[in-house]
Amino acid sequence: MSLCGQYRLTRLFVYLGLLIMGGMSAPAAAQDRYVLAFGDSLTAGYGLRSGEGFAPQLEDTLRRNGIRAHVINAGVSGNTAGQGRTRLKWTLDGLKVKPDLAIVALGANDMLRGLPPSRTREDLDAIMAEFKRRDIPVVLAGMFAPPNLGLRYMTEFNSIFPDLARKYGAPLYPFFLAGVVGDPKLNLPDRVHPNFQGVKKMVSGIAPTIIRALQD
């Protein structure tokens, strides 16, 4: 092949290479996703060491599933739904970023104190409405009242969560303590709050619902 022919061939390969490179885009960088865990002691990590609570364990699980998540712990031990309602607006106003998703996990203390289910419903409804007003999707974590509170109380309380999930089109995780409540191996000595292993089970239960919500 002549030098002229080699030159033309080289130019052709360079041109084709530039076309190929120009048509290829770099993979999109993983997007940071912010999840607000808004609840009570079950969210706050009562009685646990740093890194053992719900928020850090959920964040770790989401990251292991390819989601560059930042889970914001907005749990306050002892909070009822009413107390959560009171602090919701200033909690959201104080955040540096708007959450991509919120987990609402309140109502356990209402039930333990025997507060009227109608009051709990009203407070949770207001919380869900505020998130909707701010265009923040919610996963609602439900709670079940035990039979010793009576059939009427149990029926009224347990219906709150599926009713509100339907009203606001929110994914419902039916029972936040599924597989944990009543198991001494998964709870602190008070038999109320989950230990590290208990929280791990809670996270493994709710994580698929969170992942689906973040992917929608």
Where are these regions (language model features)?
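Position-driven detector of the extreme protein N-terminus
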Residues: 2, 22-25
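Bacterial N-terminal signal peptides
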Residues: 13-23
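Alpha-helical cap/lid subdomain in secreted, periplasmic
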Residues: 57-60, 67, 85-216
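Short, flexible micro-motifs
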Residues: 40-43, 48-50, 78-81, 110, ...
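Serine-esterase "nucleophile elbow" of acetyl-processing enzymes
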Residues: 29-79, 87-98
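N-terminal secretory signal peptides that target proteins for export/translocation
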Residues: 1-9
